[in-house]
From Swiss-Prot:
Membrane topology term: Multi-pass membrane protein
GN (gene name): MT-CO2
Enzyme class label: translocase
Annotated Mg(2+) binding sites: 198
GO biological process: ATP synthesis coupled electron transport
Quaternary data: Component of the cytochrome c oxidase (complex IV, CIV), a multisubunit enzyme composed of 14 subunits. The complex is composed of a catalytic core of 3 subunits MT-CO1, MT-CO2 and MT-CO3, encoded in the mitochondrial DNA, and 11 supernumerary subunits COX4I, COX5A, COX5B, COX6A, COX6B, COX6C, COX7A, COX7B, COX7C, COX8 and NDUFA4, which are encoded in the nuclear genome.
Enzyme Commission number(s) of this protein: 7.1.1.9
Keywords tagged on the record: Copper, Electron transport, Magnesium, Membrane, Metal-binding, Mitochondrion, Mitochondrion inner membrane, Respiratory chain, Translocase, Transmembrane, Transmembrane helix, Transport
Annotated compartments: Mitochondrion inner membrane
Residue numbers on the Mitochondrial intermembrane membrane side: 1-14, 88-231
Name of the molecule in the record: Cytochrome c oxidase subunit 2
């Protein structure tokens, strides 16, 4: 999760987020080099006496400042398209989880398990335990297996919402009457926090998302326990 005064992105816990952070650093380095070059040229213009003010024809420099930006754009576009196609790959997901946005809470349905569904509300401040985070904790955490491809089906029952977990590199709009799809996976166990990222009304700030990734065998035990309890 984010920390106070953090300037960079959150630590990645999924392969997609690792690719996004690498692309972010790649694009930032290109921007830094361009900015340095422009600043250098501006400083030269302000400090150097111009001796060729009457030059009207410079084919070489015109070719350079036409071709060079095109090459830079290609260097940015190719990795961007690669990541875009990676986020749309769905190869035999282990589990399907449906997230439904409401004003102002989330509902979750495990499509592969019969009658396994629950609502997830924000935990009020006066119910927080020591070490829990204000405005980020929920009463029912979403438990998922780690190191598994999980297909998310995201929709809404009322207004526009957005299901976002930054450390997993997932941000998908929840639209009434439409079912959007996303893929997520975590390479390590732990708690990962997110929030609704679409202004959806007066309590938009009170729609946190908490994902708890655990080991396969522990997840099966958890799912079996919930199924027995629901009988």
């Amino acid at each position: 999760m984010a920390t106070p005064a953090q300037l960079g992105l959150q630590n990645a816990t999924s392969p997609i987020m690792e690719e996004l952070i690498a692309f972010h650093d790649h694009a930032l380095m290109i921007i830094f080099l361009i900015s340095s070059l422009v600043l250098y040229i501006i400083s030269l213009m302000l400090t150097t006496k111009l001796t060729h003010t009457s030059t009207m024809n410079a084919q070489e420099i015109e070719m350079i400042w036409t071709i060079l930006p095109a090459i830079i754009l290609i260097m940015i576009a190719l990795p961007s398209l690669r990541i875009l196609y990676m986020t749309d790959e769905f190869n035999k997901p282990y589990l399907t989880l449906k997230a439904i946005g409401h004003q102002w809470y989330w509902s979750y349905e495990y499509s592969d398990y019969e009658d396994l569904a629950f609502d997830s509300y924000i935990t009020p401040t006066y119910f927080l335990e020591p070490g829990e985070f204000r405005l980020l904790e929920v009463d029912n955490r979403t438990t998922l297996p780690m190191e598994a491809d999980i297909r998310m089906l995201i929709t809404s029952q009322d207004v526009l919402h957005s299901w976002a977990v930054p450390s997993l590199g997932v941000k998908t709009d929840a639209i009434p009457g439409r079912l959007n799809q996303a893929m997520l996976a975590s390479m390590r166990p732990g708690l990962f926090y997110g929030q609704c990222s679409e202004i959806c009304g007066s309590n938009h700030s009170f729609m946190p998302i908490v994902l708890e990734f655990i080991y396969f065998q522990d997840f099966e035990v958890w799912a079996s326990y919930l199924y027995i309890v629901s009988l």
